[in-house]
Amino acid sequence: MDNTSKINKITKIEVQKRNKKRVNLYINDEYAMAFSTELAFKHNLKIGQEVDYKELKVIAEEDNYIKCKGDALKFIEKSYKTERQVYDKLLSKGYDNKTIERVIDFLTEYKFIDDWRFGELYIEERLKREGRNKIKYSLMQKGISESIIDEKLNCVDRDKEKDALNKIAEKKYKSILKNEEDKTKIYNKLGRFLMSKGYLWEDVKSVLNKLLYSDG
């Protein structure tokens, strides 16, 4: 018989043994679904109560949202994450797009995720050891939009950026000198290293000339 045409009554609401925050619902003496105790109270579900499957579908969607939100909050609790990172994580756990988007809206509204802030903090921390090209690539891989990245990078103090480059270059230069004396080889080796760190060529060229060919 079609479930939508017969009377469906709740015959049992059972708290799960392994998770006291969830209950099992039985309809007409058959297991129907499981959901949070929060929803059982919210919908005032009782034994003997008649229910229709439209109502159960609503409860199932709400329960899925609650679980999805819980997984999202757990994912971001130890470190700041981008919207893309959260989305991909939830998608990998099997949640549907509609539920994920709803959770993303919640996280964004309450500032649990903020791509602008993430970009700012990431750039500030990475500038100590990487150039803007590598930083930009990494942020794009994390799902930050190029417009946000460019705006944040344009606010970077160029003197601080060059100071960081100089320190890294000097340290690597001293290391290379232990095994190499030819200036051309040092120039090429050090140049490749600094470029791999994501620094701009004009900055790299300047520091190479300073280290290798400056009289001072």
Curated annotation (Swiss-Prot):
Record-annotated membrane-spanning stretches: none
Keyword field contains Isomerase: no
Keywords in alphabetical order: Cytoplasm
A cellular component annotation (GO) from this entry: cytoplasm
Family annotation (Pfam families): RecX_HTH1, RecX_HTH2, RecX_HTH3
Location in or out of the cell: Cytoplasm
Keyword Cytoplasm: yes
Swiss-Prot/TrEMBL GO biological process terms: regulation of DNA repair
Role: Modulates RecA activity.
Family the UniProt entry places it in: Belongs to the RecX family.
Name under which the protein is recorded: Regulatory protein RecX
